[in-house]
């Protein structure tokens, strides 16, 4: 049995990689880029720095900086209009997962038209949009190396998973120095998101030897460095490990898919505006406990790769240590419960069935080692609400 592996054509990795943008554009034959980003990147001066580098190389750029933290079909519309009305030959995505996801959608809609819901899973979007160069500024989503984008349909409060080669960046510039200014909360949420990607890719029913290698190495990089990056924002070694780990985790899940945590996380984010990484963190311990009986050896491998279990530990002991570590990470990194985040219990329980249906419809739960029924997902939402 063969497995299809999809990657960016070109990746620059390491300190200062973002400074290679002009050269990369030239190598790709692009000279009229639209920079897609958010207001924070403008305020931090990152956009001016990159635009200045391009100008020095004789490349004129424009900027769309109105992406939202959890992008909606409406929030990207102005960017799509800019592409349709302009003469751009490429898109540069600068920021965390949300600007990169927005840029992916803008590149496809700007070239082919239609509505975002037209491209939702299970459609396989193989059409090539505008060439996309991704420059991540968080160590989390791995979106710079994935063939997915997540956009919320604000008319139904559904986070739509869109997948296909058309959403894969042609190039990624992975510069950990851009993460040195991240606040602890963002570091924690994006870091746990990356760890979730690695774990879910490894236990996915679509996993392969290739994705396994990326996922295990991602866990080896992420787990020992997450606390250091959270507690010591200027720790360059920890930041570098987190950035590379997040990208490897992105490569892993882009080729093996994510599973139940992500399937259940998207409705929480859509209905209650919980940041994606944070909703994953809320779910990860409970979903892992639910899933371990169906793939105990795979989860034990995760515990060993993360450095919390020894090679000599039994599978059962390793999995106990894995669950203890996931709970400890949430506690030490101050991950709130749904109630502590501010979600009303009545509303959460009222939406359980709708969230369960949306989770199943996304397709991600079908990749889980233990594939849940709708009733089991409803029960798991209750478990997450009631957990200490």
Residue ranges of each PLM-predicted region?
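C-terminal catalytic subdomain
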Residues: 256-324
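N-terminal small/polar loop signature for handling phosphorylated ligands or for N-terminal nucleophile
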Residues: 42-117, 227-239
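Short, surface-exposed alpha-helical segments at coil->helix boundaries
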Residues: 43-51, 296, 323, 353
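Glycine/threonine-rich beta-strand-loop-alpha-helix active-site module
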Residues: 74-177
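Carboxylate- and glycine-rich phosphate/diphosphate-binding segment that chelates Mg2+/Mn2+
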Residues: 148-256, 375
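C-terminal charged capping/lid subdomain of soluble metabolic enzymes
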Residues: 299, 303, 309-388
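An N-terminal, well-structured beta->alpha segment
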Residues: 1-64, 387
């Amino acid at each position: 049995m063969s497995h299809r592996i999809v990657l960016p054509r070109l990746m620059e990795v390491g300190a200062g990689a973002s400074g290679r943008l002009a050269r990369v554009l030239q190598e790709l034959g692009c000279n009229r880029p639209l920079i897609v980003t958010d207001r924070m990147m403008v305020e931090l001066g990152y956009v001016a720095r990159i635009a200045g580098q391009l100008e020095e190389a004789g490349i004129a750029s424009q900027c769309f900086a109105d992406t939202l933290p959890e992008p909606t079909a409406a929030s990207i519309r102005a960017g799509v209009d800019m592409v349709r009305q302009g003469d751009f030959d490429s898109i540069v995505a600068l920021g965390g997962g949300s600007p990169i996801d927005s840029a992916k959608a803008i590149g496809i809609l700007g070239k082919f038209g239609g509505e975002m819901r037209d491209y939702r899973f299970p459609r396989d979007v193989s059409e090539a949009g505008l060439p996309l160069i991704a420059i991540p500024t968080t160590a989390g989503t791995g979106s710079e190396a994935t063939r997915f984008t997540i956009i919320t349909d604000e008319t139904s409060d559904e986070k739509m998973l869109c997948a296909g080669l058309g959403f894969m960046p042609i190039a990624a510039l992975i510069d950990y120095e851009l993460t040195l200014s991240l606040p602890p909360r963002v570091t924690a949420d994006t870091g746990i998101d990356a760890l979730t990607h690695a774990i879910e890719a490894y236990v996915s029913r679509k996993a392969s030897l290739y994705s396994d290698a990326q996922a295990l190495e991602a866990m080896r990089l992420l787990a020992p460095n997450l606390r250091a990056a959270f507690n010591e924002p200027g720790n360059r070694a920890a930041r570098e490990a987190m950035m590379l780990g997040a990208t490897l985790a992105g490569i892993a899940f882009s080729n093996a898919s994510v599973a139940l945590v992500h399937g259940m996380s998207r409705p929480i984010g859509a209905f209650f505006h919980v940041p994606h990484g944070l909703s994953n963190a809320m779910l990860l311990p409970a979903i892992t406990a639910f899933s371990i009986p169906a793939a105990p050896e795979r989860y034990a491998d995760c515990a060993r790769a993360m450095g919390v279990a020894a090679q000599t530990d039994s599978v059962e002991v390793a999995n106990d240590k894995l669950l203890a570590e996931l709970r400890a990470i949430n506690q030490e990194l101050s991950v709130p419960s749904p109630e502590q985040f501010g979600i009303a219990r009545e509303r959460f329980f009222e939406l359980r069935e709708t969230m369960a249906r949306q989770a199943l419809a996304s397709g991600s739960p079908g990749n889980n080692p233990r594939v849940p029924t709708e009733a089991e997902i409803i029960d798991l939402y209750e478990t997450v609400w009631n957990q200490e």
